[in-house]
Amino acid sequence: MDYLPIFVELKGRLVLLVGGGEVAARKATLLLRAGALLQVVAPELCSELQQRYQAGELEWYQGEFQPEYLDGIFLVIAATDDRILNHQVFSEADKRSILVNVVDDQVHCSFIFPSIIDRSPVLVAISSAGKAPVLARLIREKLEALLPSSLGTMAKIAGKWRERVKQRLTSMRQRRSFWEQAFNGRFAMLVANGQIQQAEKQLEQQLEQSDLQGELALVGAGPGDPGLLTLKGLQVIQQADVVLYDHLVSSDVLDLIRRDADKICVGKRAGNHSVSQEETNRLIVKFARQGKKVVRLKGGDPFIFGRGGEELQVAASAGIPFQVVPGITAAIGATAYAGIPLTHREHSQSITFITGHCREKGNELDWPALARGHQTLVIYMGTVKAALISHQLILHGRAEDTPVAVIGCGTRLEQQVLTGTLLELEQLAQQAPSPALLVVGEVAQLHHQIAWFGQQSIAKISRPAVVDFA
């Protein structure tokens, strides 16, 4: 972090603005809105600053900058087109440990101005640390569209009710849940519609019925890239009191969870169940009965080889309200990022998803059906059983030279795609980083032509594996 983002109280503080042109006028508008006692040093003032001076909104020292003008000053801005003068202002202010900003000269700044979204008393500040001001402006424009104009009014009402809520709800968790419900519910809608009295009545009713009920949200985290987490998924994990997450959830997605939420890893890996499913079920019920918002965060989609349905059955049996937020499953996300279309008119007319967590004999899968041509087979958690899968498919008629791909860390910056043939599947799987997805079918060869993300060089096995299942 190059800069510490802070909000500075300027009401009643002396601020010196050196410069009298249009740029200085824009800074003056911002400073006066923040309540600063503004002093301007310039030989002449532009029309806007002249009007403010005549209205008594600022003091004007007509003439050149003098170091003694810094006496008693809290903050300084140099906004002239004279570089030598700007550098002098910076030097004199810096010697006195006074915060100083030289417009469009980051080297001579002890602080910089962010892009601002003003929904007072709510303020959003966006900065690129001076590296990309246009990018910061574009981010601000996107956020402006997302944040309702009623946000400030909502915050003012909340401020008025804050002490009353604090007296009624003694724990921080209760208060947080109360306000989250208010800001996401009918209260917010009424404020947005300008129905302020009705909005306050809604708050009063909510406060009278403030007994907290726990709930469960089953959320799909997607395959790894945090940009593939759904908007609803992001909203839910940022409201959670407790997040029970799997190993497959990427660290980038975990970073999006609200900082004061309890994060508990209940992940299971092949051959190593660090937390049993029974213990996970117990934790869901335990925390929800404490009135907490519990998020069960699973890699990919929670209903595809994630045991999400079993966990919802437990919640339903315990009388715990729940919701499901789908996620982009690895078979969709990882193959897209690898440049492997799951269907193609010339190569594949159907898709089958299977899990590699199968018994050694492999009797539970319909291998003859899986071995048919002109289809794409995607195997989750198949690294350990890659040799068995390859053997069974070849045994039941799939050609040894069928193209395959193993996608390790799909959609993440460290993504690797290894391609080869079905006969080489075990060796490819052993080389790929975890988590890995196995793709069998002619579409795998299209990676060479339309790979677009991350490491596009292809690792390919040249010698076939020799596996004896006799």
Swiss-Prot record:
A family per Pfam: TP_methylase
Pathway given in the UniProt record: Cofactor biosynthesis; adenosylcobalamin biosynthesis; precorrin-2 from uroporphyrinogen III: step 1/1; Cofactor biosynthesis; adenosylcobalamin biosynthesis; sirohydrochlorin from precorrin-2: step 1/1; Porphyrin-containing compound metabolism; siroheme biosynthesis; precorrin-2 from uroporphyrinogen III: step 1/1; Porphyrin-containing compound metabolism; siroheme biosynthesis; siroheme from sirohydrochlorin: step 1/1
Binding residue positions for NAD(+): 22-23, 43-44
EC number in record: 2.1.1.107, 1.3.1.76, 4.99.1.4
Keyword annotations of the record: Cobalamin biosynthesis, Lyase, Methyltransferase, Multifunctional enzyme, NAD, Oxidoreductase, Phosphoprotein, Porphyrin biosynthesis, S-adenosyl-L-methionine, Transferase
Residues forming the catalytic site: 246, 268
UniProt family annotation: In the N-terminal section; belongs to the precorrin-2 dehydrogenase / sirohydrochlorin ferrochelatase family. In the C-terminal section; belongs to the precorrin methyltransferase family.
Entry GO MF terms: NAD binding; precorrin-2 dehydrogenase activity; sirohydrochlorin ferrochelatase activity; uroporphyrin-III C-methyltransferase activity
One annotated GO biological process: siroheme biosynthetic process
Residues holding S-adenosyl-L-methionine: 223, 299-301, 304, 329-330, 381, 410
Residues the record lists as Phosphoserine modifications: 128
Keyword Protein biosynthesis: no
Residue intervals passing through the bilayer: none
Entry keyword Repeat: no
Precorrin-2 dehydrogenase /sirohydrochlorin ferrochelatase: region residues: 1-203
Function: Then it catalyzes the NAD-dependent ring dehydrogenation of precorrin-2 to yield sirohydrochlorin. Finally, it catalyzes the ferrochelation of sirohydrochlorin to yield siroheme.
Protein name: Siroheme synthase
Catalytic activity: uroporphyrinogen III + 2 S-adenosyl-L-methionine = precorrin-2 + 2 S-adenosyl-L-homocysteine + H(+); precorrin-2 + NAD(+) = sirohydrochlorin + NADH + 2 H(+); siroheme + 2 H(+) = sirohydrochlorin + Fe(2+)
Region (Uroporphyrinogen-III C-methyltransferase): 214-470
